[in-house]
Amino acid sequence: VMSITERLFARIFKEILNYNDIIKFDRITYLEALNKYGCDKPDLRNPLVLHNIKDIVKDVEFKVFLDYATKKDSRIVALKVPNGCDLSRKDIDDYTELVKRFGAKGLAYIKCENISNIEDGVTSPIKKFLTNDVLQSIINKVDANNNDLIFFSADNNKIVNNSMSVLIKEIGVNLGLLQGEWSLLWVTDYPLFELDTKTKQITSIHHPFTSPKNPDDLDGDPLSISSRAYDFVINGNEIGGGSIRIHSKDVQTKIFKLLGINDEEMNAKFGFFLNALSYGCPPHGGIAFGIDRLAMILLQLDSIREIIAFPKTQSTACLMTESPSEANNQQLAELSLKTIKNK
């Protein structure tokens, strides 16, 4: 699937964009993408990456770091901004407000004006909570240079990832850090399952027919199982996604049971399918692309609305057909529906 996709896009770039350079298709796992970029659709033209520093700051006196240093499902990260000391106070305040919109409580930072002199050349509102050894370890970890600025974020995984991935994108664009014209990327090894926080039940991240990367892992922790699902990303935009499907009856049955589907329900809903698998099924998979989004990227436009003939409004109304509109009584009767008006 990936090989066919890569050949297809090499041809698209050559014939539509007249792009004759060799196209590089990068690959990154889902966990690596979250760890380095905070999202599963990074733009690799942007050199900014997150660095985990929980081990470095676990014993400092800064309460924000201490609160998350020992918590599960939490992160403490550092983000180096090249020549970030040139940012104004307003710039830093604007970035702080940006991450707050995504749940972050704030945005701590240190300025590395002269890294050879930690005592006087490194300044920060939180410096009094950090020893010189800790500061030096952070500088080494992110490979900071003179005039760089280092932002910090500490919170649960979701908030850190959501807020810092947006910050990476914003800073990369604002400071003109993007390198090259195109970034074509495969994101692989997505988790097979996730935990529904409301029901506390295991659910499929994609769908229950996605093949596990290693079927033997189904006997272990469901939340640690990787799948054979993949996304195709161009310049930080998800263009397509797909998976290799399950072709084994035994594996499919195990998946259903992990999802809490008992034998009776399994036979009622999927008996025909499991029976078909028992006769032998070749390995198979696929991918689906968002053509509208692809056109937007190829035309280097900022909004998908620009390439849709009759885009919906933000309230999902269609100005051309004036839909959605009310259904008449005959239409409702055909569907065995009735409307209930609010009193």
Regions of interest found by a model, annotated:
Residues 1-343:
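Class II aminoacyl-tRNA synthetase catalytic cores and aaRS-like
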